[in-house]
Amino acid sequence: MKILIAIIIFSAIILFHEFGHFLFAKLNGISVTEFSLGMGPRLWSFQKGETRYSLKLLPLGGSCAMVGEDTAEEEIPGSFNAASVWGRISVVAAGPIFNFILAFVLAVIIVGFVGYDPAEVLEVDKNSAAAEAGLQNGDIITEYDGYHVDLAKDLYVYMYLNDLKEGDTVTLKVRRDGRTETISYTPDVSVRYLLGFNRSDASSMTVESLIDGMPLQEAGLQPGDTITAINGVEIADGEAYDAYLAEHPLSSESVEITYDRDGLDYTATITPKEYRTPQLGFSYNLGYTKTSGLRILKYGALEIKYMIRTTLLSLKELVTGQLGFQNLSGPVGVVDAIGTTYEESKSEGTLMLWMNMLNMAVLLSANLGVMNLLPLPALDGGRLVFLIIEAIRKKPINREIEGRIHFAGLMALMVLMVVVMYNDILKIF
């Protein structure tokens, strides 16, 4: 069921994108030879007028094939190149624009049912640097270190992608009683001492994984080892471990760890590693607030703005190397993500299940719109670059040269899709 729903959502987004191309091709007198959902061999099709409408085997894409779209011919009546340059620009741009329109409509539905998430300060820690700087409960954060904040999720994503370092100064703009206040402070630093391991579950003391460069790994412990004592005090389970640390917090002093491996006891003397973390000194809203009237449209638009900004920020992180290639997902990964969200949302009730599905559709549709507008050969954005140059020059770039560039881009895109799909499959299985 989850796979079917995921495929339907993904296919609907692709179909709406291609419908944008199709509609504006018709409006500009360009003949469409085939409008299809999916890739590969046809499963079913029918002919109406000049256009064949097809459903194909692989539900991983779609197409709107126009006469003369990939040729240098201009004389063919009804061909893509026979249309005016602004007509062709509208046809190419319509796909991504329709994705943004679809995302906006779905976002408005979500906001209408669920509401929006204001970046409201819920609680300021007493005696913290934030409290001393004047931050108050109920303040609405509108800017964080120069980054404009419309919604709480804006704040969350920005802080996730931009680690706060010790000594950094945080500058907030907040809305309070109808006026804007500016608050600057240097966050306090929390000091903890860590051993550097993850347990298989909260009740167990079996080491599931070790953190690179941390004390337990450097002492030679391995996944599967079970910690049985600390400084001679028996640790029977996770609860006993938590109780021990509550009474004897780790510090810079060495501790003696006893652990079991394959039925044999071993002992290691370990110095916990200091871990310093800047603390913002406040918590903020992650829930939703109901709204009505035109504000639904406003916050629907802000949801789309958030999705577009997040996509662009993620692309920036990929280019700068802060996100790895393994973070990319293709159609297989997208379908799996939708399916996983579907399964995890079942326990939240029918309304939230479908709101989460719509939210995934908003994210994917906005993401597809942004990605297609990238100025890369074979993508809509790459075609728009050539068309805009043609509009400025009053004459087209050599069609054969343009065709070769787009073909090379298409080949590179297909190779990337295969690699990303392989990566998706590895992550799933």
Regions from the PLM with identified roles:
Residues 79-83, 194-218, 226, 233-234, ...:
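Functional transmembrane alpha-helices
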Residues 49, 60, 137-140, 166, ...:
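Short, flexible surface segments
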Residues 10-14, 65, 99, 103, ...:
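Alpha-helical transmembrane segments of multi-pass membrane proteins
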Residues 89-122, 157-161, 165-211, 217, ...:
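PDZ/PDZ-like peptide-tail recognition elements
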Residues 28-29, 33, 114-132, 136:
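Alpha-helical transmembrane signal-anchor/signal-peptide segments
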Residues 131-153, 216-240, 304:
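Conserved PDZ fold ligand-binding element
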Residues 2-75, 371-393:
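Small-residue-rich helix-interface/hinge motifs
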Residues 58-126, 408:
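Internal alpha-helical transmembrane segments
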